[in-house]
Curated annotation (Swiss-Prot):
InterPro entries: DUF402, FomD-like_sf, Ntdp-like, SA1684
Entry function: Has nucleoside phosphatase activity towards nucleoside triphosphates and nucleoside diphosphates.
Enzyme nomenclature, EC number: 3.6.1.15, 3.6.1.6
Family listed: Belongs to the Ntdp family.
Residues given in the record as Mg(2+) 1 binding sites: N90, D106, D110
Highest taxon of source: Bacteria
Keyword Magnesium: yes
Protein name according to UniProt: Nucleoside triphosphate/diphosphate phosphatase
Catalytic function, reaction form: a ribonucleoside 5'-triphosphate + H2O = a ribonucleoside 5'-diphosphate + phosphate + H(+); a ribonucleoside 5'-diphosphate + H2O = a ribonucleoside 5'-phosphate + phosphate + H(+)
Organism whose genome encodes this protein: Staphylococcus aureus (strain MSSA476)
SUPFAM superfamilies from the UniProt entry: FomD-like (SSF159234)
Cofactor: Mg(2+)
C-alpha cells in the first residue's frame, strides 16, 4: 500500500492525470512544489516533458503555475505567454498525493481563459461521449456541473488563482526557487 504524502516546498514531483475508467491520461514529468498542504498544492513548471496515454510526448512551451485544491473538482494551469496570462482549467476530481505523484481524474470539460478575461467552456461533446462510455455516475455529473459554475464565478470575480496577486506572488516564488 502506498501512503499518502503532502509534497514539500521545493520538491519536484510528477503529476498524473487519469480517466474515470482508471487508465492513465497524461503525465507531467516534473513540477516544482511552491506550496503543499492538505487542501492546496501550488506548483510551477517550465519546458516540462508531458507524456500522453498513447506514448506521444511533447514539452510545455512556457512557464506555468498549477493550482490544485482538495475540495474543488477542478485544477488550474496559469500559463505565462508573450501576450499575457492564459488559464487552462480542467474539470477533475480533487487531487490526491502519494509517494509516486500528485494524481487526479480528468473529466473532459475544460475552461480556457484569455488575457482579456473572456473564457470558453470546451470539450462538452467529449464529456458527453465519455460520460456514456465510462458510465459516469449521475452524482458526478451534478458535482461537475456545480463546479463549472463555481469556476466561472472565480474567473469573473478574479478569485483564487485568477487574482492578480496570486499570479504575481507565485510566479516570483517559482523564479526564486529555480535560481537555487
Amino acid at each position: 500500500m502506498v501512503r499518502e504524502s503532502i509534497p514539500k516546498e521545493g520538491e519536484n514531483i510528477k503529476i498524473q492525470s487519469y480517466k474515470h475508467d482508471g487508465k492513465i491520461h497524461r503525465v507531467w514529468s516534473e513540477t516544482t512544489i511552491l506550496k503543499g498542504t492538505d487542501h492546496v498544492v501550488i506548483g510551477g513548471n517550465d519546458h516540462t516533458l508531458v507524456t500522453e496515454s498513447d506514448g506521444r510526448t511533447w514539452i510545455t512551451r512556457e512557464p506555468a503555475i498549477v493550482y490544485f485544491h482538495s475540495e474543488y473538482w477542478f485544477n488550474v494551469i496559469c500559463m505565462f505567454r508573450e501576450d499575457g496570462i492564459y488559464y487552462y482549467c480542467n474539470l477533475s476530481s480533487p487531487f490526491v498525493c502519494d509517494e509516486e505523484a500528485l494524481k487526479y481524474i480528468d473529466y473532459d470539460l475544460d475552461i480556457k481563459v484569455y488575457p482579456n478575461g473572456k473564457y470558453h467552456l470546451l470539450d462538452e461533446d467529449e464529456y458527453e461521449q465519455h460520460m456514456n462510455q465510462m458510465n459516469y455516475p449521475h452524482d458526478i455529473d451534478i458535482i461537475l456541473r456545480r463546479n463549472v459554475d463555481i469556476l466561472q464565478q472565480w474567473i469573473e470575480q478574479k478569485k483564487g488563482p485568477f487574482a492578480p496577486d496570486f499570479i504575481k506572488v507565485w510566479n516570483e516564488r517559482y523564479k526564486k526557487i529555480r535560481q537555487y
